[in-house]
Amino acid sequence: MAEAAAPGTTATTSGAAAAAAVAAASPTLTPTVASQSPAAGGGGGGSGGGWTKQVTCRYFMHGVCKKGNNCRYSHDLSTSQSAMVCRYYQRGCCAYGDRCRYEHTKPLKREEVTAANLAAKSDLPASSSLPALVEPLAEVSTGEAESVNSNFAAAGAGGEDWVNAIEFVPGQPYCGRAAPSCTEAPLQGMVIEEELEKQQTNVEMKKQLCPYAAVGECRYGENCVYLHGDACDMCGLQVLHPVDAAQRSQHIKSCIEAHEKDMELSFAVQRSKDMVCGICMEVVYEKANPSERRFGILSNCNHTYCLKCIRKWRSAKQFESKIIKSCPECRITSNFVIPSEYWVEEKEEKQKLIQKYKEAMSNKPCRYFDEGRGSCPFGGNCFYKHAYPDGRREEPQRQKVGTSNRYRAQRRNRFWELIEERESSNPFDNDEDEVVTFELGEMLLMLLAAGGDDDLTDPEDEWDLFHDELEDYYDLDL
């Protein structure tokens, strides 16, 4: 034994070299070491045992294994554990059911995954195979056994507390084997949990709200693939996203705006329901014909009239224009009669109503302009839209500069002559009614655009008054 160990053995001989030397010197221990080496090294090929028989053959699972019984992997699906998990079963939609060739297992939770990792680490061969080799070697030689034991002890330092070792996480600093003294391990766990929570939050934010649950009619309930939102206190619908704060604030803001509009509408109905027309003396909202339940708002006074009565009053022919344009009660002239479904009395609200009325008129095409084929007597000051077939708007005409006072006086005299002629006779008795209307409008535009110290007027209300007079007198729909 001394001759076999002396030539190539020193005090620092490795464990593997010592094991080989002992096996060569002692013939009784050779079968033991030889029988353990195949198990430790993974066994040979063929149909023999070994760790390969614990792994299911993937080719056999698909029915295409060419080796048959000579395959070194397991062909028994009942005793071996499948490495292929059915992803459709995990989603709850596997069509094969029990006939599926893949394993039907539910996805593990975070705690179960951690326990499985610890159980897998406990099956490492380092803690079981190495002591098994040390014990038979210790019986051969005391000196060599001591060197082998010292080498194995040096190689396996800290093997007793390997269960408490820190799990290596890519991207995180490694703490080494001093797991109990490492203060960064709890922090790493907290960081990982926060990242997982952020990922789950992002997934929840990407989910869409169920449109059926928003109206309270989702038949799937908790099994719905869409997200069921929280109920809104304003509208009572499940439309608030549980995670998306921006969506929640936006919906609440829109609900508040809608609630304010509803309140304004309620107040308008409340102040309008008891208003009585000053001409027919009937409550406007209680008229038999629903189409007559509308107010005619005068621009310069706050007296109440229904639209039908005030229009009939202002279309009378037996009175002067100043009389029919004035209020029947206070005699204040108003250039506008604005149709309204609700009664408006405040000045600011009335201005908004007038502006809205003008905007509505500007969207209707002018029948006299006729998309450029005709001529409107009011030109660019017409309430209605002057547009060509291609959508272009009519450009306003430039005012004539340098017109003499004598020419303006002649045009003004001609204008008043036409007014007197209109009062003395009906211009619709002949076929030149349109010509008279256009000529009258042209002269009116000339008077307004002439400028100078002796202009007729330049306030916008006066121009609206002329427009209203022409429309009512000639029964035109300007």
Curated annotation (Swiss-Prot):
Task: Give the Gene Ontology MF terms in alphabetical order.
Answer: ubiquitin protein ligase activity; zinc ion binding
Q: Which Pfam families match?
A: MKRN1_C, zf-C3HC4, zf-CCCH_2, zf-CCCH_4
Q: Which superkingdom, per the lineage?
A: Eukaryota
Q: Which SMART domains match?
A: RING (SM00184), ZnF_C3H1 (SM00356)
Annotated pathway, please?
Protein modification; protein ubiquitination
Which Enzyme Commission number(s) are on file for it? 2.3.2.27
Q: Where is this region: Makorin-type Cys-His?
A: 232-259
Keywords for the protein's UniProt record, in alphabetical order: Metal-binding, Repeat, Transferase, Ubl conjugation, Ubl conjugation pathway, Zinc, Zinc-finger
GO BP annotations listed: protein polyubiquitination
Posttranslational modification: Auto-ubiquitinated; which leads to proteasomal degradation.
Q: Report the InterPro entries cross-referenced here.
A: DHS-like_NAD/FAD-binding_dom, MKRN-like, MKRN1_C, Znf-CCCH_4, Znf_C3HC4_RING-type, Znf_CCCH, Znf_CCCH_sf, Znf_RING
* RING-type zinc finger segments: 277-331
Q: Where do the zinc-finger regions (C3H1-type) map?
A: 51-78, 80-107, 204-231, 360-389
Catalysed reactions listed for this entry: S-ubiquitinyl-[E2 ubiquitin-conjugating enzyme]-L-cysteine + [acceptor protein]-L-lysine = [E2 ubiquitin-conjugating enzyme]-L-cysteine + N(6)-ubiquitinyl-[acceptor protein]-L-lysine
Q: What does the annotation say about its assembly with partners?
A: Interacts with p53/TP53 and CDKN1A. Interacts with TERT, modulating telomere length homeostasis.
What is this protein's function? E3 ubiquitin ligase catalyzing the covalent attachment of ubiquitin moieties onto substrate proteins. These substrates include FILIP1, p53/TP53, CDKN1A and TERT. Keeps cells alive by suppressing p53/TP53 under normal conditions, but stimulates apoptosis by repressing CDKN1A under stress conditions. Acts as a negative regulator of telomerase. Has negative and positive effects on RNA polymerase II-dependent transcription.
Output this protein's name.
E3 ubiquitin-protein ligase makorin-1
- Supply the source organism's classification: Eukaryota, Metazoa, Chordata, Craniata, Vertebrata
Gene (UniProt): MKRN1
